[in-house]
Design a protein with these regions (language model features):
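A catalytic-pocket lid/entrance helix-loop region that shapes and gates access to the active site
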Residues: 102-105, 198, 202-300
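Alpha/beta-hydrolase fold catalytic core
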Residues: 279-357
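N-terminal cap/lid subdomain of alpha/beta-hydrolase-fold enzymes
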Residues: 2-6, 48-153
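Alpha/beta-hydrolase-fold catalytic nucleophile elbow
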Residues: 84, 185, 213-216
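N-terminal cap/lid segment of alpha/beta-hydrolase-fold proteins
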Residues: 13-71
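Catalytic nucleophile loop
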Residues: 190-195
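Alpha/beta-hydrolase fold nucleophile elbow
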Residues: 176-189
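Active-site-proximal cap/loop segments of hydrolase catalytic domains
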Residues: 46-48, 105-177, 223-224, 232-236, ...
Length: 357
């Protein structure tokens, strides 16, 4: 008889996999030697069967990139944990676009970068002041659920915060940084995540932050909700942005941007919310005055503002401001403009600022 040997096809248990390199950043205050560590950190959970501990199993593999200054005192050198928003965005935008020691040479409005694209030293990197740990939330970048786990468990508010909090705890413990000043930096939805993380870290994990940095803050999602017709806050809050955008594109000749913004902010703070709350109770004169004011500030026609019932939805604004020139305005950065595919589209059909990134 011939014996047969069965070979297990089960995948090996995941383990941390990181790569470390060393570099030097040239800043305004001199050269800064630093260490870069990137890769996946495995998050694990305890397993019990009928109350009996069975060990641990992997639940997620979280991707991070950490930059730490060499020869720094960890009790005084801060560390900042950084992520973008979405939800659903990796951290590469803040990493390679703003805070990291290297950044994409991206050009600017009217001067887009041409291929071949390049990375350059970022002399204004926050690494000159704090160590940086860039984190990709679940299903973004290279972060994935472990085999047999459901990524959806981490896509919600609570699961997202729990996973990132656990990653921060692990990194802090393994790098002996509990005594370091600690900060969280979030962008857009990441500001809401950051605020929730501060409570989560302080509560279950016993880690106290020294500060939060909120970029493009949106702690109250109703402040950007244009779809709820009973919510007028977004219309008032966006008015100064519309006014600044209109000024950028020549709709306020002879006026300074600060002057235009001051008027828009004053109107958005006081008269505009009152006007919107009055609805059909506005007199003809009050409505006409509001239409004229909004048209002047936003750069739109009085006819459009009146048809919009004094409420200017942001996607429509980007498509309407330069409609006569058959161009759209950027949403992420309203200095950018691009050709409109349609001259009759209800709202912008593409974001020229996003396309330029």
């Amino acid at each position: 008889h011939t014996a047969t040997t069965r070979t297990s096809t089960a995948a090996p248990a995941p383990s941390d996999a990181t790569v470390t390199t060393r570099h030097t950043l040239r800043t305004a205050s001199g050269e800064l030697p630093y260490t870069a560590t990137t890769g996946r950190i495995v998050l694990r959970e305890e397993v019990y069967d009928d109350g009996v501990f069975q060990g641990t199993r992997a639940k997620a593999e979280v991707f991070l990139t950490a930059y730490t200054a060499d020869d720094a005192d960890p009790t005084t050198r801060p560390v900042a944990f950084v992520f973008n928003g979405g939800p659903g965005s990796a951290s590469l935008w803040l990493h390679l676009g703003l805070l990291g020691p290297r950044r994409v040479l991206a050009g600017d409005a009217g001067e887009p970068a041409a291929p071949p694209y390049a990375l350059v030293d970022n002399a204004e990197s926050l690494l000159a002041h704090t160590d940086l740990v860039f984190i990709d939330p679940m299903s973004t970048g290279y972060t994935r659920a472990a085999e047999g786990q459901k990524p959806g468990d981490y896509h919600g508010y609570a699961g997202d915060i729990s996973a990132i909090g656990e990653l921060i705890r692990l990194w802090t413990s393994r790098q002996s940084r509990w005594l370091s000043p600690k900060f969280v930096i979030g962008e857009s939805y990441g500001t809401l995540r950051g605020a929730a993380l501060a409570e989560h870290l302080q509560g279950p994990l016993g880690m106290y932050l020294n500060g939060l940095v909120l970029i493009s803050s949106v702690l109250d999602l109703s402040s950007i909700d244009f779809e709820n017709q009973r919510n007028d806050r977004a219309h008032a809050l966006y008015l100064p942005f519309y006014a600044a955008t209109a000024h950028r594109h020549g709709k306020h000749p002879g006026r300074s941007r600060d002057d235009v913004l001051a008027e828009a902010q004053e109107y958005a703070d006081r008269d505009y919310p009152w006007v919107l709350s009055r609805g059909s109770r506005l007199t003809a004169a009050e409505r006409a005055d509001a239409v004229a004011t909004l048209a002047r500030l936003t750069g739109l026609s009085e006819e459009y503002v009146d048809r919009a019932d004094l409420r200017i939805e942001h996607w429509r604004y980007f498509g309407e401001l330069l409609r006569a020139e058959r161009r759209t305005v950027g949403r992420l950065d309203s200095r950018f403009t691009g050709p409109a595919a349609s001259a009759i589209a209800e709202e912008m059909d593409a974001d020229p600022s996003f396309d330029a990134i």
